[in-house]
């Protein structure tokens, strides 16, 4: 048994399999950051912080001594509780293939959004500087006319190249922007196809972000450091329900300020 306490949950092996499957595919469907940043191997439940390799000057304890603290980024634990019906759980053992796992999917979606918001927008309470605030490139404004968006993306890629940032490059679009470029056409083709021809990388639907980002995916510029990857744990149960949660521990580091260009709506 580990500190997820799953062995104590009144959930059959078959039901656990379905719960994990729904959580995994919903999380992967909505998360975007992991597709464009480096993701570390999980450090394990005992991991509490990640070294930045830097030193912080502190007051010396006595004359003739120089003191420094090793700078580090603490890992934040993100937990999303959800409740499942025991009736729905037991239906799996009775052969049902349509148990209601909506609470699992809602929790997975919420966790994916929180992770992406931390990566791109930052999370000050957890000492995370997001890509937007860490970028040294001037943000570019997204035009109201979707037909002009490819020109702005081309400008962003040019800025990356002028800053000495090699490709490949990827473009992340918020849900609203992605819809606009998918539904608007020019010369008979969706704007999304025009963008695809411009970008030597992926065009990614990123529903958690605001606006858009153009960034390099060459590696070594952005680092999602995990303590424990997304896991499902058990809290309690009663005669009718089981209380579970999705959880991960992480921090995020930006190593290269010029490696991304934010696009603002």
Swiss-Prot record:
Domain of life, per lineage: Bacteria
Assembly description: Found in a complex with DyP, suggesting it is the native cargo protein. Monomers form pentamers, which assemble to form hollow shells composed of 60 subunits with several openings.
Coiled coil start-end: none
Protein's cellular compartments: Encapsulin nanocompartment; Cell membrane
PANTHER family: PEPTIDASE U56 FAMILY, TYPE 1 ENCAPSULIN SHELL PROTEIN
Protease keyword on record: no
Summary of the function given for this chain in its UniProt record: Shell component of a type 1 encapsulin nanocompartment. Assembles into proteinaceous shells 23-24 nm in diameter with 2-2.5 nm thick walls. Cargo protein DyP is targeted to the interior via its C-terminal extension; probably only 1 DyP hexamer is incorporated into each shell. Probably involved in protection against oxidative damage.
GO cellular component: encapsulin nanocompartment; plasma membrane
Pfam families: Linocin_M18
Protein name: Type 1 encapsulin shell protein
Family: Belongs to the encapsulin family. Family 1 subfamily.
Classification lineage: Bacteria, Bacillati, Actinomycetota, Actinomycetes, Mycobacteriales
